[in-house]
């Protein structure tokens, strides 16, 4: 406002130097023509990218703005700013409350240098109408975040846990003496048969502390996301229906960005390691 009034005084014949001194502005502000801001776009009609971001956010209601931006960037093949995603999601009321940030934080426990060096394994249960509770064993590779093996059975005994380990070892051709398997202190994992099987396979068994889920952070996190995205929203009639949906979810999981991998996918990270190994041999 002072610059505009100063220009009016100069136009009426006053000296620019004196006007600038009294108005406490620079002479450049008097001589420089005012720059008009373009009119605000207003709500208007959203572009194709904005509409795509909305659809992605609706399809992934448990994900935050960073993950939605990463997924949208891949699908649209362009860089998507997180703040843009946040603005769009806020406009469409798609933002979720941020969970408490005062939860206990610890320095990283795990230092892995290659795939098949450290696996985390655990068991959870899901509900089916016909069979009641059924038991899901799953293993996550702490390097690539892939799921090397999983099983869904009517029981959660030692035999089912061993079968899951065998599936992962055979499927990934794990050599003896190269793998450490981390579990909690569940009865099937502390059983004599399970420990004997790991010893026979040359697998080092590392058990976490009691009431310490952070010692199994990767598999606990994976189960948490699986339950939010699939298990709590599903109504399975039979165990076969559950197996079908879990298999589909794991395939999708392998090809979606992972925040722990700097928003690369587990499949991409695993392929990078395979390429490095092939070039080294």
Predicted feature descriptions by range:
Residues 1-14, 50-59:
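Short, amphipathic alpha-helical "recognition" segments used to contact nucleic acids or chromatin
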Residues 13-15, 63, 237:
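Residue-level signal for the short linker/turn that defines the boundary of a DNA-recognition helix
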Residues 16-22, 68, 72:
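Short alpha-helical "recognition helix" segments of helix-turn-helix
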Residues 19, 98-102, 180-185, 200-218, ...:
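RNase H-like polynucleotidyl transferase catalytic core
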Residues 27-118, 212-213, 265-277:
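Basic, flexible linker segments flanking DNA-binding modules
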Residues 78-140, 160-167, 171-178, 281:
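Mobile-element integrase/transposase regions
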Residues 141-142, 152-157:
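A short acidic/small-residue loop/turn micro-motif
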Residues 199-203, 224-281:
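C-terminal domain-tail junction helix/linker
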């Amino acid at each position: 406002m002072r610059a505009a009034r100063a220009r009016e005084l100069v136009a009426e014949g006053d000296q620019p130097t004196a006007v600038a001194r009294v108005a406490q502005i620079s002479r450049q502000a008097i001589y420089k023509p005012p720059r008009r801001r373009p009119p605000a776009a207003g709500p208007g009609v959203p572009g194709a990218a904005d509409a795509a971001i909305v659809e992605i956010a609706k399809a992934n209601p448990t994900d935050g703005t960073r993950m939605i931006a990463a997924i949208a960037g891949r699908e649209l093949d362009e860089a998507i700013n997180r703040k843009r995603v946040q603005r769009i999601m806020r406009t469409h009321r798609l933002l979720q409350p941020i969970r408490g940030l005062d939860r206990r934080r610890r320095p990283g426990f795990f230092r892995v240098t290659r795939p098949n060096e450290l696996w985390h394994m655990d068991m959870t249960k899901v509900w089916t109408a016909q069979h009641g509770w059924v038991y899901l064993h799953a293993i996550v590779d702490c390097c690539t975040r892939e799921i090397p093996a999983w099983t869904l059975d009517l029981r959660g005994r030692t035999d089912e846990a061993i079968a899951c380990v065998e599936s992962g070892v055979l499927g990934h051709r794990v050599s003896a003496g190269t793998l450490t398997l981390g579990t909690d202190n569940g009865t099937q994992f502390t059983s004599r048969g399970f420990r004997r099987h790991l010893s026979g396979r040359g697998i080092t068994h590392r058990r976490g502390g009691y009431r310490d889920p952070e010692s199994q952070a990767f598999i606990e996190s994976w189960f948490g996301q699986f339950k939010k995205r699939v298990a709590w929203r599903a109504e399975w009639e039979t165990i076969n229906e559950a197996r079908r949906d879990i298999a589909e979810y794991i395939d999708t999981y392998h090809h979606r960005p992972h925040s722990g991998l700097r928003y690369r996918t587990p499949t991409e990270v695993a392929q990078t390691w395979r390429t490095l190994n092939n070039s080294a041999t």
